[in-house]
């Protein structure tokens, strides 16, 4: 440890890395707690405190130089970004996608059901007349694929996505057809839908 304290630039690097790790765990733990993943959040908090105890003493005792302070602040900001990126990659939980479309003849609900999504749809009325509204629940890791699919089927559709707090009953308790969602690509919609219709 004395080797680190005697080398100014190595100290800068150490402070930066320790703070990135600490704040990454802190950010992930906060997000996981808000999403309701209590036990995973508790495990992450263990690592967070471990880094805090082992590393922060070194960090705080060497903030007497401007470069160390800058490294500490920069590591903090990078740690937040890294933590959020990791959570995005994990894509925990589900997303509700609400779609409003004027194109009844496209039969979007059945097109999406053929691809493995659970769709609830109903008629609604706006300023310009009748519209079809669809509510679709999907795992977060398939959110982008779903939105690309909808845009390919109906480029003018109005789409809103948000995260539900609690889920109970319905299509999802019976088991989502994840294999279908995983296997297709939005660019290959026509052939996939034709295959599903023919197989029925």
Swiss-Prot record:
Its main location: membrane. CDD domains: YitT_C_like_1. The chain crosses the membrane at residues 8-28, 40-60, 66-86. Keywords: Cell membrane, Membrane, Transmembrane, Transmembrane helix. InterPro entries: DUF2179 (IPR019264), DUF5698 (IPR044035), UPF0316 (IPR022930). It is a multi-pass membrane protein. GO terms for cellular component: plasma membrane. It is found in: Cell membrane. Belongs to the UPF0316 family. HAMAP family: UPF0316. This is UPF0316 protein SAOUHSC_02131. It comes from Staphylococcus aureus (strain NCTC 8325 / PS 47).
